Amino acid sequence: LSTTPLLQAAGLRKTYPTGGSRLVAVEDLSFSLYAGGALGLVGESGSGKTTTVRMLVGLERPDQGEILVQGAPLAARTRGRAARLARAKAVQIVFQDPYLSLDGRISIGATLDGVLRLHGCADRPARAARVRELLAQVGLGAREAAALPRGLSGGQRQRAAIARALAVEPAVLVLDEAVSALDVSVQAQVLNLLSDIRRDTGIGLVFVSHDLAVVRYVCDEALVMYRGRTVEHQPVAELLAAPQHPYTRLLLASVPHPGWDPEGIGRRRRELASSQEAAS
């Protein structure tokens, strides 16, 4: 087995101008993801998850630090067709809303065919066979291939979006709240599918979520972000059994359960924010 991580983030920092100063969105973020691994990036709105995702897929350039995919630097805002295609083959993303990656005017099969053609598969029968293979991989068939996105259920659309991302055989798949809009039973089906895919292909998954239950289900490790910083990074089982940081404990307490105390949680949240502001 290779000892080179599929994906490595080292000392990432990203700021944005705001007024006369700069807002620190991500500060000193580091992690490694190996073949077949699954890392959960956990945090609420404003934690830095979205900025991190944009850096991982090359849409933003970090102010400091670097991102390596299979040992090679990931270029941001790449110019030139060949370079853009190479970046797409390194890291793909599946969004919460599959309509962001599926053209509503084109059938699912034609969408997949177009991706394969764009990435150099000129042989039509070979593309048709690969489309069938991709659809089968995500549990879809000929009926779904012929359908427009609006003719599919939410779960089927998300499966189609996953198939589209897998078409280029990326090293890493980033899933940005990819199941949060689905019913719980459909969530479980998609999460099982993702677990099967990483086992069968060795692809690395980065699962971005505010939902610790989802992270528990599919990830090996979890990295908890708060105000742009990593506050905890552990194997999922250890993090959930014995969270070390007050924010991680607050996230766990925020999940509804018998004896749930929303007012107490809100008070703890304000106290944590005040203590962090005082520390900074």
Label each PLM-derived region with a short phrase:
Residues 126-143, 252-253:
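Conserved ABC ATPase "signature" region
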Residues 148-152, 156:
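Conserved ABC ATPase signature
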Residues 42-44:
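The feature captures the beta-strand-to-loop junction immediately N-terminal to the Walker
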